[in-house]
Amino acid sequence: MALPHAILVSLCEQASSGYELARRFDRSIGYFWTATHQQIYRTLRVMENNNWVRATTVLQHGRPDKKVYAISDSGRAELARWIAEPLSPTRPGRGSALTDSSTRDIAVKLRGAGYGDVAALYTQVTALRAERVKSLDTYRGIEKRTFADPSALDGAALHQYLVLRGGIRAEESAIDWLDEVAEALQEKR
């Protein structure tokens, strides 16, 4: 996911200055997508040049003037396009739920689902779930082949096993969440 799309979702909810956006990011979208204040300001400038946002200067007495950004019609069109755009596929066993940007992308797309194509988002959720199942199957295969008796493990082998278990648990959790999301989206389609 590109930072501009997370910013567009946030601006759909409320016009904001760069500072206000950064604070709101820290309290909401920032739980699954992080950006520094500098990244947000840089991105806002690019988005303004692309006509995705409009800036209005607000005079402040005793303080520097501030720019308040609002999403434009072309910004809404870009957000809708991105929400409908399929996720980039991951290879099974690579880019697990612990590290894959697709899960973060889905979270931001869900946050902005009211501004896009929910049916397309549902398709992406079910496709991502299928990828997560493939990764889980890969991890379980490794577990079965390599760690047949976990109670006998120690040292480096135990540590490797524990990392693998973390990947398995993360995939299971991601699949459970994606099932919940798919069910909710299916009911509202």
Curated annotation (Swiss-Prot):
Looking at the Swiss-Prot or TrEMBL record, what is one Pfam family this protein matches? Answer: PadR
The record's annotation in Gene3D superfamilies points to: 6.10.140.190, Winged helix-like DNA-binding domain superfamily/Winged helix DNA-binding domain (1.10.10.10)
Cystine connections: none
Description of what induces expression: Likely autoregulates its own transcription.
List the Gene Ontology MF annotations in alphabetical order. DNA binding
Would you say which domain of life the source belongs to?
Bacteria
The primary location reported for this protein is cytoplasm
Q: Where in the cell is it found?
A: Cytoplasm
Which key words are in the record?
Cytoplasm, DNA-binding, Transcription, Transcription regulation
What Gene Ontology cellular-component terms does the record carry? cytoplasm; peptidoglycan-based cell wall
Q: According to its UniProt entry, what is the function of this protein?
A: Probable transcriptional regulator that may help mitigate the effect of oxidative stress and help mycobacteria survive inside macrophages. Binds to its own promoter region.
Q: What is known of its domains?
A: Contains an N-terminal domain (NTD), which harbors a winged helix-turn-helix (wHTH) motif that is used for DNA binding, and a C-terminal dimerization domain (CTD).
Q: Which family does it belong to?
A: Belongs to the PadR family.
| Subunit field text | Homodimer.
Put simply, this protein is called Probable transcriptional regulator Rv1176c
